[in-house]
C-alpha cells in the first residue's frame, strides 16, 4: 500500500477547495492558518498545546481578526477593480449586517479596520440599532436600518441623523412610512428614506424562499406606488434616496443574482423617470461562501462564482442601465456579512471516546453448539465474492431480521442474538470492502457506509456551536487538525455531549463530495485528538441555544505578529452558575438548600462530616466551572 502523504490529506479533505488560501497543512501534518498576506503560518496544534498550558480547554472558538481585515480589503479591492473596468462614476459602500455575528469584539474589529474603507453597518432590530449607533463613530459611514420598526426605533434613528449620522431608514411596511413622516415633521428633519422592494426574482439554495413573491419583507409594485403617493402628499419626495432588495442568503447560482440585479435596475430607472432622484441602491446580502469547496451551483453549501464576479455584476448592471437612460450612476451598497465573517472563526473540539459496531474475531468458527443462524451468516461471510455481493447482502439482512424476531418471541437467547449481530456486522464490513471494487455499486449497498461508521463522541454542543448544522443540515468543513501525515483508518460520525439524538453530524464534505462519515484516525492513548470545524464565523455564535444548559464556549483571539502568532485575548466560556441564572435559578439559593440537606444527612449518619464538606466543596466549585467536560 502506498505511503500516506500530506498531499493525500489535502485531497481527501479538499482543504485547498474551501480553504481559499487561509488554511493548509504543514510538513508536520498539522493544519495551519494563514491570516495575513505575508503568508505567516499559524499551527493550530501548537495553538491548542499553548492553550492547554494556560488551562483553556476545548471546546474553544479560535478567532483570527486578521482574516476579517483581509476579507474587508478583498471585497473593497474587488469593487475598486470593477469600478475601473466599467468606468463607474459613483461610490460603493461595503456594509456589515451585525446580525451575522453581533459579538462585540468581532464588530469592533470590523469597524476598526473598515474605517479606512468607509465600511458601514446594518441594524435589523432595536437592540442592534442601539449597538450600531454607539459603535459607528465616523459621521460619513453609512448606517442602514432594516427590520420591523416602531415609533421609538424610528425616533432614535432620526435623532442620530439629526446629530450627523448618515442613517437610512429602510421602509419594510407602509405603516413605517407614516411613522417616519410624523416623527420627521416633529423634529423638523428631512429623513433619509429607503424602500425595500419585493422583487419577483429569488435566490437559490437553502434560503431561496427569502426572496420572490413569498418573501417576508418588502413592498410590492402596487404598494410602492402607494408609498410614492404618500411621500408626495407629505412633501417628502426628495427624501426617497435609496432602494433596497434582498433575494436570500448564501445564493448558490450567479445567474439568480444577475436576474435580480436586472430587475432592480429597472426600478431605479422607473423611479428616476417619475422624478424621484434615488441616489443609492442597496443590493442586500446573498454573496455566498463555498463551504464544501466544490464551486458547484448544485450544492446548497457552495457557490459557482467569486467575489469579483459578484461585484462585477453589481457594478456593470447599474452602470449599463444608467448609461442607456442618461442617468447618474447610483451609489451601490452591499450587505455581504457572511462573506466577511465566515472564514475568521474555527471551532476546535476534542474527541472524548469512540464507539464502533461489534464484529466477530477473524479466528472465529462456529461449532456444533452454535445456532444455525450463526452458521448461516458465517457461511455467507466465508464465501463472499464481488459477483454475488448483492445477493449475499439480502441473505444476511433476512437472517438478522429472523434472529431479532426469534429473540423477541423468546426462542433464541441473548448469547445467540449477540453472535448473530457480530457476525452480521462482519459480513457488512466485507461487503462494503468488496463493493468498492465494483464498477457500478448497487444503490442498496451505498447505505452500508453510513451504517458502519464509528461514533466519535466530542466535547461540544451542536445546538450551541453549530446551530445551522442541526437546523438546516448546513455542511461545514470538518477535519482533524493533526496527524495528517498519517492515513486515516476509521470513518466516523460526530456525536456531541447533549442528551439529544439530534446532537450529531452525519454529513461531511470530502474529496469534493458529500459523505455520511468523516475519515479520521484511531485514537492514541493519553494523546488528545482534535477536530477543527471551519468557516463558522457567520451566524453560528449568535444562533446558538442552551440545550442541556451548555453555554458559550471559550473564545480566543489570535493575531499574526513578527512571523509568529500572538494570543491577544482569552474570553472564558460561560460557567454553570451563569447558565443557571439565564433560566432563573438563584445559585446562592441552590447552595443554601443543599447545605441544609447535607447537614441533615450528616446528622442522620448517612454521610460523615468530611464527606459532607467534600460534597459541598465539589458543588460550589462546579458552579464556577465550565459547562463542558474538563
Where are the model-predicted features located?
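Short, glycine-/Ser/Thr-/acidic-enriched flexible segments
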Residues: 30, 38, 67, 101-103, ...
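Low-complexity, highly charged intrinsically disordered N-terminal segments
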Residues: 25-102
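Conserved, well-structured core domains of diverse proteins
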Residues: 1-57, 559, 566, 576-579, ...
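Active-site-proximal beta-alpha core segment in soluble small-molecule metabolic enzymes
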Residues: 87-282, 287-289, 293, 304-309, ...
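Flexible, glycine/charged-enriched surface loops at secondary-structure junctions
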Residues: 58, 62, 84-89, 274-278, ...
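A non-catalytic, amphipathic alpha-helix used as a structural packing/dimerization or gating element
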Residues: 66-74, 226, 263, 313
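Short alpha-helical segments and helix-capping/turn motifs at coil-helix boundaries
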Residues: 7-9, 73-81, 104-109, 129-130, ...
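Charged (often Lys/Glu-rich) extended helix/loop segments that serve as interaction or gating elements
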Residues: 305, 313, 319-630
Amino acid at each position: 500500500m502506498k505511503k500516506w502523504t500530506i498531499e493525500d490529506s489535502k485531497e481527501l479533505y479538499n482543504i485547498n477547495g474551501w480553504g481559499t488560501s487561509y488554511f493548509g497543512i504543514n510538513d508536520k501534518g498539522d493544519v495551519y492558518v494563514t491570516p495575513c498576506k505575508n503568508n505567516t503560518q499559524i499551527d493550530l496544534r501548537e495553538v491548542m498545546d499553548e492553550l492547554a498550558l494556560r488551562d483553556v480547554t476545548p471546546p474553544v472558538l479560535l478567532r483570527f481578526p486578521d482574516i476579517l481585515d483581509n476579507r474587508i480589503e478583498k471585497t473593497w479591492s474587488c469593487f475598486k477593480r470593477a469600478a475601473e473596468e466599467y468606468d463607474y462614476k459613483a461610490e460603493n459602500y461595503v456594509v456589515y449586517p451585525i446580525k451575522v455575528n453581533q459579538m462585540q469584539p468581532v464588530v469592533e474589529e470590523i469597524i476598526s479596520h473598515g474605517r479606512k474603507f468607509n465600511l458601514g453597518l446594518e441594524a435589523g432590530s432595536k437592540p442592534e440599532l442601539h449597538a450600531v449607533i454607539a459603535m459607528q463613530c465616523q459621521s460619513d459611514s453609512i448606517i442602514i436600518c432594516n427590520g420591523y420598526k416602531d415609533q421609538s426605533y424610528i425616533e432614535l434613528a432620526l435623532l442620530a441623523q439629526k446629530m450627523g449620522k448618515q442613517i437610512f431608514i429602510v421602509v419594510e411596511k407602509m405603516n413605517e412610512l407614516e411613522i417616519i413622516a410624523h416623527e420627521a415633521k416633529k423634529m423638523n428633519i428631512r429623513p433619509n428614506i429607503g424602500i425595500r422592494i419585493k422583487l419577483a426574482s429569488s435566490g437559490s439554495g437553502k434560503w431561496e424562499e427569502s426572496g420572490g413573491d413569498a418573501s417576508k419583507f418588502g413592498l410590492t409594485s402596487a404598494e410602492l406606488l402607494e408609498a410614492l403617493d404618500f411621500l408626495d402628499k407629505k412633501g417628502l419626495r426628495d427624501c426617497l434616496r435609496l432602494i433596497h432588495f434582498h433575494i436570500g442568503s448564501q445564493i448558490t447560482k450567479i445567474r439568480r443574482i444577475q436576474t435580480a440585479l436586472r430587475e432592480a435596475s429597472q426600478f431605479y430607472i422607473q423611479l428616476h423617470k417619475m422624478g424621484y432622484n434615488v441616489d443609492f441602491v442597496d443590493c442586500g446580502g446573498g454573496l455566498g461562501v463555498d463551504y464544501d469547496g466544490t464551486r458547484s451551483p448544485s450544492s446548497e453549501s457552495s457557490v459557482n462564482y467569486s467575489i469579483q464576479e459578484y461585484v462585477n455584476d453589481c457594478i456593470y448592471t447599474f452602470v449599463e442601465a444608467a448609461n442607456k437612460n442618461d442617468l447618474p450612476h447610483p451609489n451601490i451598497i452591499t450587505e455581504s456579512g457572511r462573506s466577511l465573517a465566515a472564514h475568521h472563526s474555527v471551532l476546535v473540539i476534542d474527541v472524548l471516546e469512540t464507539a464502533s459496531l461489534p464484529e466477530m474475531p477473524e479466528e472465529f468458527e462456529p461449532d456444533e453448539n452454535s445456532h444455525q443462524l450463526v452458521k448461516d451468516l458465517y457461511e455467507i461471510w466465508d464465501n463472499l465474492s464481488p459477483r454475488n455481493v448483492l445477493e449475499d447482502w439480502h441473505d444476511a439482512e433476512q437472517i438478522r431480521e429472523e434472529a431479532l424476531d426469534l429473540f423477541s418471541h423468546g426462542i433464541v437467547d441473548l448469547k445467540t442474538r449477540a453472535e448473530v449481530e457480530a457476525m452480521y456486522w462482519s459480513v457488512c464490513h466485507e461487503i462494503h470492502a468488496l463493493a468498492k471494487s465494483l464498477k457500478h455499486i448497487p444503490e442498496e449497498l451505498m447505505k452500508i457506509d453510513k451504517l458502519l461508521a464509528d461514533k466519535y463522541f466530542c466535547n461540544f454542543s451542536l445546538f450551541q456551536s453549530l446551530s445551522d448544522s442541526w437546523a438546516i443540515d448546513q455542511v461545514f468543513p470538518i477535519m482533524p487538525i493533526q496527524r495528517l501525515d498519517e492515513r486515516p483508518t476509521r470513518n466516523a460520525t460526530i456525536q456531541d455531549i447533549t442528551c439529544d439524538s439530534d446532537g450529531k453530524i452525519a454529513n461531511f464534505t470530502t474529496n469534493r463530495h458529500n459523505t455520511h462519515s468523516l475519515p479520521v484516525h484511531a485514537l492514541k492513548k493519553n494523546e488528545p485528538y482534535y477536530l477543527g470545524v471551519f468557516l463558522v464565523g457567520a451566524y453560528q455564535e449568535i444562533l446558538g441555544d442552551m440545550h442541556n444548559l451548555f453555554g458559550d464556549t471559550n473564545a480566543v483571539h489570535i493575531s499574526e505578529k513578527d512571523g509568529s502568532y500572538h494570543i491577544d485575548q482569552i474570553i472564558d466560556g460561560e460557567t454553570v452558575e451563569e447558565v443557571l441564572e439565564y433560566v432563573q435559578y438563584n445559585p446562592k439559593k441552590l447552595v443554601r438548600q443543599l447545605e441544609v440537606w447535607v447537614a441533615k444527612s450528616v446528622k442522620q449518619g448517612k454521610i460523615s462530616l468530611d464527606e459532607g464538606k467534600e460534597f459541598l466543596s465539589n458543588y460550589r466549585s462546579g458552579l464556577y466551572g465550565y459547562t463542558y467536560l474538563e
